[in-house]
Amino acid sequence: MKYQKPKGTADILPPFSKEWQFVEQNARETFALYNYEEIRTPIFEKFEVFSRSAGDTSDIVTKEMYDFDDKGGRHIALRPEGTAGVVRAFVENKLYGPEHQKPVKVYYMGPMFRYERPQSGRLREFHQIGVEAFGSDSPKIDVETIMMGMDFLKKLKVSGLKLVINTLGDKESRDRYRQALIDYLEPHFEELSDDSKARLHKNPLRVLDSKDKNDQKIVENAPEILDFLTEDAQKHFTSVKEELDTLGVDYVVDSSMVRGLDYYNHTIFEIMIADSPLGKGDVTICAGGRYNGLVEELGGPEVSGVGFGLGVERLLLLLNAETQTTLQSKQLDFYVVGIGDLVQNDVLKVVHELRQMNFVTEQDYLDRKPKAQFKSADKLNAKYVVTIGESEMNDRIFKLKDMHSGEERTVALSEINTLKDLLK
């Protein structure tokens, strides 16, 4: 029987795993500058964690969730996104308590699962990097979150970034807008797609996010949320814009933009790039916003949150296309060639000592002739080759060859520590 990976998954093989490490390390370095720390939550949660947070009408819950009953009869779901599990952990571990400095700032990275049609950059098992900050109602944390996403992408040298923002207002704003949207859409009910018909009275804002072309035409002239904001909601959004202006950040306000998850309110944003391998026109590579009711929804007190998420696979597609090359593995510092059976203990010691000095070091494991070992050193692009034969062993020395210049010299085994300065 021929075994293959499940549809919609991928094997991340060397040397491409280095690209993932590169992205993850840059994320960690960027987030640390903003005083964020890593959080790790389970890959699966109780189904209700996602159904209550994402919303019963969201595509994630109605179409895309991997859920099942386990052997104990518990309804379990593989996580389709990162925020809900982080919020659950925040509530369960009482991170809202007075002993924890506010805002609580965390980031996460790891696999997520959605049953979607696999396509380039969109798999059923995909990887997400995200951040969440809890405990501040200030527009400053909204702006900080946006800037952190921008800084991360700029650190990766992604060019042509476009920031799009909107507000979904507070509860009163949304209630007023919700009714206005229903009043506008009801006369078009029979023209709407089946999905939008089902959402009209449950969450009409999701109709604005429909991918159906006819739905998109209908909502072109729909009322805009900016006309229904309360004074407080307007003040919050104005502060966000003013702070972005202060930082010299260009942005576009798109009043029709909503988020695919039901828990967002106030500031939402997307960081886009135009005409890339991800698609023609503006394509979103990072998205997020504020969610002031989600902690309460999952059993906690009234605590606000704000965050973003981005897909690693899509980001790597973009990075590789922009650089026209894949990231290289760290170059091999030393390849140690052993000639003859009698020298193998010395080879073992030299390899070990070089690694203790933090040099990337390799040796032969296949009992090959010296010529084959030198070929391996060349293929692995080693900077230096150490050669130990029986005569070198007897004289307690080894030969050191610079593979770039071809220069070769002799080094005493007792002076191997002098190589510490060799690659500085």
UniProtKB/Swiss-Prot annotation:
| Annotated PANTHER family | HISTIDINE--TRNA LIGASE, MITOCHONDRIAL-RELATED (PTHR43707:SF1), HISTIDYL-TRNA SYNTHETASE (PTHR43707)
State the encoding gene. hisS
Spell out the PROSITE patterns in the cross-references.
AA_TRNA_LIGASE_II
Query: What domain of life does the UniProt record list for this protein's source?
Result: Bacteria
Q: Which GO terms describe its biological process?
A: histidyl-tRNA aminoacylation
Q: What is its EC number?
A: 6.1.1.21
Q: Which stretch is the leader sequence?
A: none
Q: How does it assemble?
A: Homodimer.
Mind naming one GO cellular-component term on file for this protein? cytoplasm
Keyword Chloroplast attributed: no
Xref: InterPro entries: aa-tRNA-synth_II, aa-tRNA-synth_II/BPL/LPL, Anticodon-bd, Anticodon-bd_dom_sf, His-tRNA-ligase, HisRS-like_core, HisRS/HisZ, HisRS_anticodon
Q: What single Pfam family name could you report for this chain, choosing any that match?
A: tRNA-synt_His
> Of which family is this protein a member?
Belongs to the class-II aminoacyl-tRNA synthetase family.
Localization, UniProt? Cytoplasm
Q: Look up keyword Protein biosynthesis and say if it applies.
A: yes
Instruction: List where the protein spans the membrane.
Output: none
An annotated Gene Ontology molecular function: histidine-tRNA ligase activity
Q: Which reaction does it catalyse?
A: tRNA(His) + L-histidine + ATP = L-histidyl-tRNA(His) + AMP + diphosphate + H(+)
Question: What protein does this entry describe?
Answer: Histidine--tRNA ligase
Q: Any idea which UniProt keywords this protein has?
A: Aminoacyl-tRNA synthetase, ATP-binding, Cytoplasm, Ligase, Nucleotide-binding, Protein biosynthesis
